[in-house]
Amino acid sequence: PLKDLLSLRKEAEDALDSAFPQAEVDKTGSKSISIEGGSLTRKVDVVPSNWYNTNKYAETGSDIYRGVQILDKSVPTRLANTPFLHNAWIDHKDVNTGGGMRKACRLMKSLKYDSENIDLSSYDIVSIAFNIPDASLTYPQGGELLILSACLDYCRQLQMNSALRESIEVPDKHRKIFCDGHATLLGLNQLTQELEQLANDVLRENQRSFRRL
């Protein structure tokens, strides 16, 4: 029940305060409790939730169709999610692109963590990468820099094409990426700017290397 999740959220907040006295525990998030600093090397999000058995799970018994319901304390309500199906689709695309999918995810997520100025969740960044065409993420040996070009080109397409931007979905298809309360054009612009800066840095470094030949 919802009241049990609300109680679990309060217990988790108190437990984190007690277990990590030197860290900063941010309890303001509607869906997660964030903790960073102290003995932690990076920010961690704790998301109170409960199991949720979808109709597809009941039909197949396959764990990839089992879902969770995440507490949104601001309403309060529970939001259904299917993380195992999400991961299965990510794995599938990564195989189809020879590892390019996960490289694109790591690249854009690293820019988010390094800059701290990209107002997009890691989930939505991964979802953007998931929608990049497979051919753009498939590269020859030694051609890893093509992943940067693929990410930048696709983000520019999303900037210019509002119909495309508003149509793309998260991997498990339960919502659009760009919708109320989730990814925004501002966040996309910030990500694109960081990708452009990285591409310019790579170009300058390559030019210096050629001049030394």
Located regions from the model:
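Catalytic cores of NTP-dependent nucleotidyl/adenyl transfer enzymes across multiple folds
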Residues: 2-157, 210-211
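Terminal (often C-terminal) interaction modules
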Residues: 161-213
